[in-house]
């Protein structure tokens, strides 16, 4: 076809698409969302009956936020105070690792992970994750292990950890005490509910905790309203077979009490997670295919006016085309370079993007740093019924650490900084320390009567208490006397099946007054084969 014929077809096809969209809008206004879904299903089924296979249309939604602006609730928090608190926690988390490195003992830690996860963690802790109360069982918060400095930093502000303890990060045996690198209840039994440092352990642990909690709930064994299990994970961590391999259990058991929050900063320990792909889209397909509720938080509020004028979806198509490696390159490129690569030769897209200056384009936020978008996602997650929820949040590794770290492949291994970097970051975060104190990575705590500290404590008080926390108020159980097993300890004069002995021992323990009521035999299929 000639160029003129091509152009005519393009214009006619655009009109055709717009007419279909207008028709769909009319159906929505007249009948509602449910009927729109039914109509689309019918159209898809008809296409399939005609031999047209829609391979890409079933498990992926466009590369944009799941919750549209029209359905976004208002944010209940104080942005100014939450900014200040988050910045203080960011500073102290970074200072903790820098002080450990400055000892010259070869110690380090992870700075960049919490830098990317700080905003989502703070929104969750200020507004959603509840502690145990008289009528509520309490939520469980299992964190992304490399983000532990941020949790320690918050606990320090809350008064749950001392200055000596956080000053001895990775040096637990110091006389004044110290802190372990990663979460484990054996190391800090009052803080960490579950170990999460081994890659893949956090997800599977959280699912099985949620399953057990649902077991207790379904049998009326909980005296309080059941809580949620929150698992904060990294996108690289999602490649672990233990994580993905257990998600079907959560959907099959209808575990609407588990929420996965995946920090998609697009980088793993040693480079990109999916340089030539899109990890968020990949995970969306995996989780939707497994029956999970999927919520994506990709773009910040600055994009909303651009979506409003993107009537022909040219910007959306570009968002869908660009791969993670290119998005990461944008994070280390100037606004002008981003614009040139993003627009290419598309005049309509150029017109849309002209609403942003190069500086605005450079500084535009990913969804993981927008409290409004995060709040909307978490609110929908906690109200999900009948199925588990995963929230896929796009962030930037090393966010706020300056051009030497943000989005760069070396960000994960960043353990130290120059004096100039420390001062520059402290200034940007608004930390009121002297330049020398910033060089020394000194900790900062506001006055206990300050607005920031009052807000910090009030928010946790409103949610029942501090988190994360491990509840260990369990009844002590007396072990049965050895006489209970004398049939086995005395021995017999013939060989006997170990399976038979096991069954008899369990039977005796089930009849024992002290412990019998706490034993729950879980019988696998093989039990029938073995005569159990």
Which residues does each predicted region cover?
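Cofactor-/ligand-binding subdomain signature composed of acidic, glycine-rich
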Residues: 16-19, 23, 42, 55-101
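Amphipathic alpha-helical packing elements
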Residues: 13-53
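Residue-level marker for buried hydrophobic side chains located in beta-strands
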Residues: 231-232, 260, 522
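Short internal beta-strands
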Residues: 141-144, 257-265
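Glycine- and acidic
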Residues: 6, 23-26, 74-82, 100-109, ...
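Cofactor-binding active-site loop characterized by glycine-rich and histidine/acidic residues
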Residues: 77-89, 93-105, 110-253, 276-277, ...
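Non-catalytic terminal/interface segments that mediate subunit docking, oligomerization
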Residues: 67, 72-93, 114, 129-132, ...
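Long, well-ordered, tryptophan-enriched scaffold segments
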Residues: 264-493
């Amino acid at each position: 076809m000639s160029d003129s014929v091509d152009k005519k077809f393009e214009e006619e096809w655009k009109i055709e698409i717009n007419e279909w969209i207008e028709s769909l809008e009319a159906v929505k206004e007249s009948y509602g969302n449910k009927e729109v879904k039914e109509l689309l299903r019918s159209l898809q089924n008809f296409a399939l009956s005609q031999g047209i296979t829609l391979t890409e249309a079933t498990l992926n939604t466009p590369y944009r936020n799941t919750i549209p602006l029209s359905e976004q609730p208002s944010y209940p928090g104080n942005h100014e105070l939450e900014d200040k608190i988050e910045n203080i926690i960011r500073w102290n988390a970074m200072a903790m690792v820098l002080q450990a490195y400055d000892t010259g003992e070869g110690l380090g830690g992870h700075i960049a992970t919490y830098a990317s996860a700080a905003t989502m963690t703070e929104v969750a802790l200020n507004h959603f994750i509840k502690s145990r109360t008289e009528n509520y069982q309490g939520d469980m918060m299992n964190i992304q292990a490399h983000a532990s400095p941020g949790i320690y930093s918050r606990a320090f502000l809350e008064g749950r950890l001392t200055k000596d303890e956080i000053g001895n990060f990775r040096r637990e045996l110091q006389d004044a005490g110290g802190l372990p690198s990663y979460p484990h209840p054996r190391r800090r039994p009052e803080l960490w509910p579950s170990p999460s440092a081994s890659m893949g352990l956090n997800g599977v642990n959280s699912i099985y905790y949620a399953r057990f909690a649902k077991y207790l709930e379904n049998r009326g064994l909980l005296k309080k309203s059941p809580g949620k299990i929150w698992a904060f994970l990294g996108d690289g961590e999602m490649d672990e077979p233990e994580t993905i391999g257990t998600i079907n259990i959560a959907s099959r058991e209808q575990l609407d009490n588990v929420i996965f929050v995946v920090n998609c900063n697009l980088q793993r320990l040693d480079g990109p997670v999916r340089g030539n792909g899109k990890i968020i889209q990949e995970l969306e397909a995996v989780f939707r295919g497994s029956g999970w509720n999927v919520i994506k938080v990709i773009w910040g509020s600055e994009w909303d006016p651009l979506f409003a004028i993107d009537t022909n979806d040219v910007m959306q198509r570009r968002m869908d085309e660009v791969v993670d490696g290119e998005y990461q390159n944008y994070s280390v490129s100037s606004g002008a370079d981003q614009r040139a690569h993003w627009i290419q030769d598309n005049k309509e897209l150029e017109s849309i993007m002209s609403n942003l200056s190069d500086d605005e384009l450079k500084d535009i936020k990913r969804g993981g740093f927008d409290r409004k978008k995060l709040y909307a996602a978490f609110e929908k997650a906690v109200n999900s019924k009948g199925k588990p929820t995963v929230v896929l949040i796009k962030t930037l590794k090393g966010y706020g650490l300056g051009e030497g770290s943000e989005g760069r492949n070396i960000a994960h291994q960043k353990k130290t900084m120059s004096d100039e970097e420390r001062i520059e970051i402290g200034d940007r975060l608004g930390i009121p320390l002297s330049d020398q104190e910033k060089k020394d990575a000194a900790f900062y705590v506001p006055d206990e009567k300050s607005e920031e500290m009052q807000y910090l404590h009030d928010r946790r008080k409103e949610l029942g208490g501090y988190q994360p926390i491990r509840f260990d108020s369990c009844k002590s159980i007396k072990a049965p006397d050895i006489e209970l097993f004398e049939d086995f300890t005395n021995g017999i004069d013939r060989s006997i099946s170990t399976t038979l002995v096991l069954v008899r021992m369990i039977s005796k323990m089930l009849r024992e007054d002290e412990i019998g009521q706490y034993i729950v035999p879980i019988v696998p299929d093989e039990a029938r084969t073995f005569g159990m």
